[in-house]
Amino acid sequence: MPGLFSANNLIKSRKAKRLADTAYRKRALGTKYKHSVLGRAPQAKAIVLEKIGVEAKQPNSAIRKAVRCQLIATGKKITAFVPYDGSVTYIESNDEVTVEGFGKKGRSVGDIPGIRFKVCKVQNVSLHAIFTGKKEKPSR
């Protein structure tokens, strides 16, 4: 049991030990936003460079469709997953796409290795709306 006048010492030791916690350190120092490709933004616009197929991790066997694109704001190149079956056909090279995060805490999802973003819009039209046939992709 700590002594009567040991509150200050307890506070000091708590602060020191708290810095060992990685989750706390990320929150306190704000490194989540410093090292994020999107910065503080939830979404970003990008130009498609090429379409690629990413092999799924074991035990699954599939080629997940993705696009390599360059962010307009920062100029950084990222890989973004294209959701919905066959919707990669709606995306061509040099199209403008909107990308957003694709997992918890900025990490990749499931059996798709190293892909932290997904495509949500093509030429400012929702990819889901194009996929379901509700809207058409505008021509340039």
UniProtKB/Swiss-Prot annotation:
Q: Does the keyword Ribonucleoprotein apply?
A: yes
Query: What domain of life does the native source organism fall in?
Result: Eukaryota
* GO terms, molecular function: structural constituent of ribosome
Which GO CC annotations does the UniProt entry carry? Answer: small ribosomal subunit
Report keywords, A-Z.
Answer: Hydroxylation, Ribonucleoprotein, Ribosomal protein
Recorded hits in SUPFAM superfamilies, A to Z, give: Nucleic acid-binding proteins
Q: Does the keyword Ribonucleoprotein apply?
A: yes
Residues bearing the modification Hydroxyproline: 59
Q: State the InterPro entries in the record.
A: NA-bd_OB-fold (IPR012340), Ribosomal_uS12 (IPR006032), Ribosomal_uS12_euk/arc (IPR005680)
The record's Gene Ontology biological-process terms are: translation
Q: Which PROSITE patterns match?
A: RIBOSOMAL_S12 (PS00055)
For this chain, the family text in UniProt reads: Belongs to the universal ribosomal protein uS12 family.
Checking PANTHER family in the record gives:
30S RIBOSOMAL PROTEIN S12 FAMILY MEMBER
NCBIfam families, per this entry? uS12_E_A
Q: Under what name is this protein listed?
A: Small ribosomal subunit protein uS12
